[in-house]
From Swiss-Prot:
Catalysed transformations (reactions): xyloglucan + H2O = xyloglucan oligosaccharides
Gene Ontology cellular-component annotations: extracellular region
InterPro entries in the record: ConA-like_dom_sf, GH11/12, GH12
Sites where a glycan is attached: N106, N171
Domain of life: Eukaryota
Keyword field: Carbohydrate metabolism, Cell wall biogenesis/degradation, Glycoprotein, Glycosidase, Hydrolase, Polysaccharide degradation, Secreted, Signal
Protein name (Swiss-Prot/TrEMBL): Probable xyloglucan-specific endo-beta-1,4-glucanase A
Family: Belongs to the glycosyl hydrolase 12 (cellulase H) family.
Extent of the signal sequence: 1-18
Predominant place of localization: secreted
Cited function: Catalyzes endohydrolysis of 1,4-beta-D-glucosidic linkages in xyloglucan with retention of the beta-configuration of the glycosyl residues. Specific for xyloglucan and does not hydrolyze other cell wall components.
Pfam families, alphabetized: Glyco_hydro_12 (PF01670)
Length: 238
């Protein structure tokens, strides 16, 4: 049966937008400028559990996705990091003018302990090891806490119109700065470059470092029948 060009294009578009679910430890799918990961990197810390991530749609630079999980055991240990990672060419911070992003998300489930965060990495060279990890927690649910050397914030800045507690601690050879929102922020729209500008001005972060990774997702510690829904996410580096 022959199809008209318009019908064929419509079918192709529908196929491209078909929902894709993956449940394996390192499962991923590439859509537009993003790689969506399941990333069950800490599942060995759990006594039981599972997780599946689903790509739902992409419109322009906006991706819609969700992840469903249940994890028990391994108290205080992160089990996974389902996330949307932006594909871009690493740039020196001094050359990064903006990192515009929007993010709308929701969580449901029982006894959820998890964070919802941007996770960004800096290196001394475009392809080198990560030297700094910059996290921006929009949600710290059920008592989830960041990496910290002291357990106390080193500052309480307001960035992008949101009040944060800022923590600092090591993750292997990396230094980790974690901006933890004082109140859960389910809808965000702003320039992530502002967080680096703050660190450059107040914590001595070098603008000669390269921005090499920009990711956003959720780190579950424990809970059951959890559904993390991202109804709107976009980010771009300019």
């Amino acid at each position: 049966m022959k199809l008209s060009l318009s019908v064929a294009l419509s079918l192709a578009a529908s196929t491209a937008q078909a929902a894709t679910q993956f449940c394996d430890q390192w499962g991923s799918v590439t859509e537009g400028n993003y790689i969506l990961y399941n990333n069950l990197w800490g599942q060995a810390q759990a006594t039981s559990g599972s997780q599946c991530t689903t790509f739902e749609s992409l419109s322009g630079n906006t991706i819609v996705w969700n992840t469903k999980w249940s994890w028990s055991g391994g108290q205080g240990q992160v089990k996974s990091f389902a996330n949307a990672a932006l594909q871009f060419t690493p740039k020196k911070l001094s050359s990064v003018k903006s990192i515009d992003s929007t993010w709308k998300w929701n969580y449901s489930g029982s006894n959820i302990v998890a964070d919802v965060a941007y996770d960004m990495f800096l290196s001394t060279s475009p392809g080198g090891d990560h030297n700094y990890e910059i996290m921006v927690w929009l949600g710290a649910l059920g008592g989830a806490g960041p990496i910290s050397s002291t357990g106390s914030p080193i500052a309480t800045p307001t960035v992008a119109g949101i009040k944060f507690n800022l923590y600092l601690g090591p993750n292997g050879s990396m230094q980790v700065y974690s901006f933890v929102a004082q109140s859960t922020t389910n809808s965000f729209s702003g320039d992530m470059r502002d967080f680096f500008t703050y660190l450059e001005s107040n914590q001595g972060l070098s603008s000669d470092l390269y921005l090499v990774d920009v990711q956003a997702g959720t780190e579950p510690f424990s809970g059951s029948n959890a559904v993390f829904t991202v109804s709107d996410y976009s980010v771009s580096v300019a």
